[in-house]
């Protein structure tokens, strides 16, 4: 499984981002433009929403939950990249 700093995401053309935080966290802070919301605990039931044949970037508050989800998806054969630092470290614009 790969990791990059969350602020590198803005340099990537058309990234597929999954935000694994809870709904209340998204309402409080917003998320990166275009991110798909799939809460961490629901990921196993939503695998059909996650593309298998392209890079998928996983986002959370600080990078810990996203690391766990990325490791899980990596074991299932997904091409995943953890966004280190999460929303707390992200310096770009957030969308609600």
Regions found by a protein language model. Give the residues of each.
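Short, surface-exposed ligand- or partner-binding patches at beta-edge/loop junctions that are enriched
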Residues: 59
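Rhodanese-like catalytic fold shared by cysteine-dependent sulfurtransferases
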Residues: 1-16, 23-55, 64-96
């Amino acid at each position: 499984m790969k990791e990059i700093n969350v602020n590198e995401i803005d340099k990537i053309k058309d990234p597929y981002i999954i935000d694994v935080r809870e709904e209340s966290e998204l309402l409080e802070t917003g998320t990166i433009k275009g991110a798909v919301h799939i809460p961490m605990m629901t990921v196993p039931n939503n695998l059909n929403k996650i593309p298998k044949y392209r890079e998928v970037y996983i986002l959370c508050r600080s990078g810990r939950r996203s690391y766990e989800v990325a490791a899980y998806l990596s074991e299932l054969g997904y091409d995943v990249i953890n966004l280190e630092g999460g929303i707390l470290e992200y310096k770009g614009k957030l969308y609600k």
